C-alpha cells in the first residue's frame, strides 16, 4: 500500500482553503486524472461537515469511479476521507490546515490500495509522481481563489 505526505505553504486564509478542498464538484476542472465528480449527500452539523461523493479518476484505458466518505472536523480543522465503494481496497487520506502569519500550512497524507493487484502495482510505481502533480494542481488553483 503506497503511503505518502505532502506539505505546502499557501498564501491564503485557512478557512478559504478548507472550503476549497470541500468543493468536490470542482475537482475535474483542475485535478489531473479526475474526470468527473458527484456529491450525493452533504450534511452540515455543529461539529462537522459530512459529505458522500464519487470521483471518477484515471487515464484511458484505466478509468474507474470510487465513493468516499469525507468528514471535516470543525474543531481541529482536519478533513478525513475514507473509501466506501469502488475499485479501492483501502483509501484513507487526511488534510490538516494550520494558519501561520502570512500563509496556511496544508498537510495532505494519503494511504491507498487498489483491489486489482496489477493496477495496484502500476499505481505504486508512479504514485509519488502522481501525488506531486495533484498537490501542484491544488496549490496552483488555491492561489487563484
Regions found by a protein language model. Name each.
Residues 20-23, 49-53, 75-81:
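Short Pro/Gly-enriched beta-strand edge/turn motifs at strand-loop
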Residues 2-6, 51, 66, 91:
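Structural detector for hydrophobic anchor residues on beta-strands
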Residues 17-20, 27, 53, 70, ...:
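Hydrophobic pocket/interface hotspot
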Residues 1-5, 111-118:
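A short small-residue
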Residues 113-145:
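A conserved amphipathic terminal alpha-helix motif
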Residues 23-26, 62, 102, 123, ...:
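Amphipathic alpha-helical protein-protein interaction surfaces
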Residues 1-48, 102:
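Hydrophobic ligand-binding cavity/cleft-lining segments
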Amino acid at each position: 500500500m503506497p503511503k505518502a505526505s505532502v506539505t505546502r505553504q499557501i498564501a491564503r486564509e485557512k478557512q478559504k482553503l478548507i472550503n476549497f478542498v470541500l468543493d468536490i464538484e470542482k475537482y475535474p476542472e483542475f485535478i489531473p486524472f479526475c474526470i468527473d465528480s458527484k456529491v450525493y449527500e452533504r450534511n452540515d452539523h455543529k461539529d462537522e461537515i459530512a459529505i458522500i461523493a464519487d470521483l471518477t479518476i484515471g487515464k484511458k484505458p484505466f478509468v474507474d469511479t470510487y465513493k468516499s466518505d469525507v468528514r471535516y472536523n470543525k474543531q481541529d480543522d482536519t478533513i478525513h476521507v475514507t473509501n466506501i465503494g469502488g475499485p479501492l481496497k483501502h483509501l484513507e487520506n487526511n488534510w490538516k490546515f494550520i494558519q501561520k502569519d502570512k500563509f496556511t500550512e496544508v498537510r495532505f497524507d494519503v494511504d491507498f490500495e487498489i483491489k486489482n493487484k496489477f493496477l495496484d502495482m502500476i499505481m505504486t510505481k508512479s504514485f509519488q509522481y502522481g501525488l506531486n502533480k495533484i498537490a501542484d494542481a491544488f496549490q496552483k488553483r488555491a492561489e487563484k481563489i
